[in-house]
């Protein structure tokens, strides 16, 4: 009698186990594949704050200072290759740069503590090759001066060198609302 109960339970539990395992695998796959949407809101600062100056190297080891971009609206983004939202927002940053690049606007992407060869290899794997300026904050001094507490963090700086907007987390930079904020600053 005990053997029959065991066999009945065993045969009943195997299909239930298979169904449960399948549902678990399916939900794990769905959770892995679904990514939250990127935001688009840039938070205005209550009043403009002067952007801290800096000088950093690009991938060609040439120095760039924030003051080199005075007179332009600057979208400045702190990022890293290991940061998934940073990687997801990179194509929209390039599209924005291509749309507005010129005398009044530029994009600066400041990489956090990674070496140039690694970043160069990473950018070669992207669907879109970034043509905006990529700088390296190898010791985090610049990110500390901007009080960056998480990646990605983005600042929108006006033509006078004042921080006007800030965003923490991934953004869809070519969203019409972001473009509107940039155009307003470009017209000031």
Task: Label every model-predicted segment.
Residues 1-53, 176, 188:
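N-terminal targeting signals for export/organelle localization
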Residues 108, 122-160:
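Short, internal strand/loop/helix patches
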Residues 112:
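Active-site loop/turn elements of alpha/beta-hydrolase fold enzymes
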Residues 32, 156-188:
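Thiol-/selenol-based redox modules, centered on thioredoxin-like
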Residues 117-120:
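Acidic helix N-cap motif at the loop->helix transition within catalytic regions
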Residues 48, 53-74:
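A short beta-strand-turn-helix
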Residues 70, 78-95:
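Conserved redox-active cysteine motifs that mediate thiol-disulfide chemistry
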């Amino acid at each position: 009698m005990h053997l029959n109960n065991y066999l009945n339970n065993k045969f009943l539990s195997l299909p239930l186990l298979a169904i449960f395992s399948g549902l678990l695998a399916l939900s794990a796959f769905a959770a892995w594949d679904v990514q939250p949407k990127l935001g688009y809101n840039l938070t205005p600062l209550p009043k403009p704050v002067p952007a801290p100056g800096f000088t950093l190297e690009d991938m060609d080891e040439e120095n760039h200072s924030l003051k080199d971009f005075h007179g332009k609206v600057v979208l400045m983004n702190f990022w890293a290759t290991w940061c998934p939202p940073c990687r997801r927002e990179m194509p929209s940053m390039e599209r924005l740069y291509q749309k507005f690049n010129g005398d009044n606007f530029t994009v600066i992407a400041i990489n956090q503590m990674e070496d140039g060869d690694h970043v160069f290899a990473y950018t070669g794997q992207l669907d879109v090759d970034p043509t905006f300026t990529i700088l390296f904050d190898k010791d985090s001094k610049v990110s500390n001066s901007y009080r960056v507490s998480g990646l990605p963090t983005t600042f929108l700086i006006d033509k006078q060198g004042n921080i006007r907007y800030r965003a923490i987390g991934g953004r869809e930079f070519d969203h019409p609302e972001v473009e509107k904020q940039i155009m307003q600053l470009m017209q000031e």
